[in-house]
Design a protein with these regions (language model features):
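Catalytic domains of carbohydrate-active enzymes, especially glycoside hydrolases
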Residues: 1-19, 121-126, 224, 228-234, ...
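Aromatic-lined substrate-binding rim segments of carbohydrate-active enzymes
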Residues: 8-11, 15-66, 72, 151-181, ...
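Aromatic- and acidic-residue-enriched segments that line the glycan-binding/catalytic groove
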Residues: 19-34, 69-95, 131-154, 200-212
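The substrate-binding groove and active-site-proximal loops of carbohydrate-active enzymes
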Residues: 26-44, 94-112, 155-167, 210-211, ...
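Active-site-adjacent "subsite" loops/lids of carbohydrate-active enzymes
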Residues: 47-52, 63-121, 216-220
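Aromatic-lined carbohydrate-recognition surfaces of secreted/lumenal glycan-active proteins
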Residues: 55, 60-72, 128-132, 160-215, ...
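Aromatic- and acid-rich polysaccharide-binding/catalytic face
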Residues: 125, 130, 147-157, 207-208, ...
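Substrate-binding cleft of secreted/luminal carbohydrate-active enzymes
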Residues: 219-245, 260-331
Length: 331
C-alpha cells in the first residue's frame, strides 16, 4: 500500500461493540480470535501494531469504529462483558441485528467514551466512522424505537426529524469528546453515497439520483455535520459506475463537490466495481482512468479513499500498478 502512494489506513477496531485492542469496556472481537471475548494467544495488540507499522512508513492510522451496531447476524454468542448482556434495555433488534438505540443519551455518551479511550491511550491520527447509523431499511419492517421516542421526543413531533436530531447530538458529542482529549486528532465519516434524491418542491439539496438516501432513510444529515464543522473530513461512498442509471458516479461527485467541498472531501472508491466496469468511451478499458479524471477536475475534491485494501494489494485490474505509475507517482 505504501508503494501505491497510500498515505492513510482506516483500520476497523470496533465492528459490533467489540475490540481489536485491549478495551476496558468491550470484549475482544471474534473476527480476531474466532470467539468473542477470547484474547489473542500469543497475546498482541493489533491496533498498537498497526499504528507502529503505519507511522514507520509515514502513513496515518485512523481507528475505524462502528458506532451503533452491537451484533451482526453472524455472531451467535456474546461475551459476558458485552454491552448488550449488561444492558439489553438500551438496544433494539432489527432484521437480525442488535443496535444501540441512538435516542438514548446514555448510549451516545457511552460510544463517545469508547472513542475517547482510544484517543487517550493510542497515538491514532483519527477516529473514523462509516455509513452505519440508524439501520438500512428492510421492506415491511419498522424501527422499534417508538417507546424511546415517546419518552425522549424533546418536543419534536416528527419521528424522522427526531432521529436526525439524535444523530446530530451524537456527532457533536463525538467531535467534542475527541477534541477534549487530543485536539489534533481528526474525526471523519464515510457516509452512504447519496445524501438526498432531488424532489420537486423540496428545499433539501438533492442529486439527480434514485436510490437510498442518507437524509431520509438513514437519518444522517451529513451536510449539517459538515456545515457545523463537526467532521474534519468526509468520504462519501460513491461506489457506483459512471453511467449507473440510479446513482451515476459523475453526477454524485459533482454534487458532493458543490455542496460539501468546503471541508476536506475525499471520494470513496470501490476498486472491484471500478475495474469490472467498462469505460463508456473505450469499452476495452475499465473506468479507473475516467473516474480519476473526473474527480481531479473538481476543485472541491482532495483525493480518494479505496475500498478495500485487499483488492489493491491483489492488483485487481492492474489498479495498484496504475496508482504507482500514474495517479500516485508523486505525492
Amino acid at each position: 500500500l505504501q508503494q501505491c502512494g497510500i498515505n492513510a489506513i482506516m483500520f476497523q477496531v470496533r465492528g459490533e461493540a467489540d475490540a481489536m485492542y485491549p478495551s476496558p469496556y468491550e470484549p475482544w472481537s471474534r473476527f480476531l480470535t474466532g470467539r468473542q471475548g477470547t484474547a489473542p494467544n500469543p497475546y498482541w495488540d493489533p491496533l498498537a501494531w498497526m499504528i507502529t507499522e503505519c507511522h514507520k512508513r509515514g502513513m496515518e492510522l485512523h481507528a475505524w469504529i462502528n458506532p451503533f451496531r452491537a451484533k451482526t447476524k453472524g455472531t451467535k454468542e456474546l461475551a459476558l462483558n458485552h454491552p448488550y448482556v449488561k444492558h439489553p434495555e438500551r438496544f433494539f433488534e432489527y432484521d437480525g441485528l442488535y443496535l444501540f438505540d441512538p435516542g438514548l443519551n446514555e448510549n451516545r455518551r457511552y460510544i463517545c467514551q469508547i472513542a475517547a479511550d482510544i484517543v487517550r491511550r493510542y497515538d491514532v491520527d483519527g477516529i473514523h466512522m462509516d455509513d452505519y447509523f440508524y439501520p438500512y431499511p428492510v421492506a415491511g419492517m419498522t424501527i422499534p424505537d417508538q417507546a424511546t421516542y415517546i419518552t425522549h421526543k424533546n418536543g419534536i413531533d416528527n419521528v424522522d426529524d427526531w432521529r436526525r436530531y439524535n444523530e446530530n447530538l451524537f456527532m457533536e458529542m463525538m467531535h467534542d469528546s475527541i477534541r477534549a482529549v487530543k485536539p489534533w486528532v481528526k474525526f471523519g465519516v464515510s457516509p452512504f453515497g447519496i445524501y438526498h434524491n432531488v424532489q420537486p418542491g423540496s428545499n433539501i439539496p438533492g442529486s439527480n439520483t434514485r436510490g437510498l438516501q442518507n437524509y431520509d432513510n438513514l437519518y444522517a444529515d451529513v451536510l449539517y455535520w459538515i456545515n457545523k464543522g463537526w467532521v474534519d473530513y468526509n468520504i462519501p461512498q460513491i461506489y457506483w459506475e459512471i453511467g449507473h442509471k440510479a446513482a451515476d458516479y459523475e453526477e454524485l461527485i459533482k454534487w458532493w463537490s458543490r455542496f460539501a467541498g468546503g471541508r476536506p472531501l475525499f471520494i470513496g472508491q470501490d476498486v472491484e466495481r471500478t475495474v469490472r466496469a467498462a469505460d463508456l468511451k473505450n469499452p476495452q478499458r475499465n473506468q479507473m482512468s475516467a473516474k480519476f479524471g473526473l474527480q481531479r477536475g473538481l476543485r472541491g475534491i482532495q483525493g480518494s479513499c479505496l475500498w478495500y485494501s485487499a483488492a489493491v494489494v491483489r492488483n485487481e485490474g492492474n489498479y495498484a500498478t496504475a496508482l504507482q505509475k500514474n495517479y500516485h507517482r508523486t505525492p
